[in-house]
């Protein structure tokens, strides 16, 4: 019979934790809105495929890797072939 009290106790603790949780408030910065709008306008003008697929994504990652860390890219090229 005591095991039923454990679940009731845990449920009460869970409800109390939710009720007494601190409230959070999102703060909007006008600079962030301006940047997001500029990015959205720039992306709206771009023409391309919405989902380029894994091959194009890997090609972009490989290009960035070769530009940023050429020694690692060379090591990977030697191992892969």
UniProtKB/Swiss-Prot annotation:
Family: Belongs to the formicidae venom precursor-01 superfamily.
Keyword Transcription: no
Subcellular location: Secreted
Annotated organism of origin: Manica rubida
GO molecular function, one term: toxin activity
Protein name per the record: U10-myrmicitoxin-Mri1b
Valine amide sites (modified residues): 80
Function: Induces paralysis after injection into blowflies (L.caesar), and then death within 24 hours. May have antimicrobial properties, like most ant linear peptides.
GO cellular component: extracellular region
The keyword Secreted is annotated on this UniProt entry: yes
Chief subcellular location: secreted
Tissue: Expressed by the venom gland.
Residue stretch(es) of the prosequence: 27-52
Signal peptide positions (record): 1-26
């Amino acid at each position: 019979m005591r095991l039923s009290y454990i679940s009731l106790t845990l449920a009460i603790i869970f409800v109390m934790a939710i009720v007494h949780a601190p409230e959070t408030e999102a703060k909007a910065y006008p600079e962030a809105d301006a940047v997001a709008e500029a990015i959205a306008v720039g992306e709206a003008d771009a023409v391309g495929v919405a989902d380029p697929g894994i091959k194009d994504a890997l090609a972009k990652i490989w290009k960035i890797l070769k530009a940023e860390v050429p020694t690692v890219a060379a090591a990977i090229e030697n191992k892969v072939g």
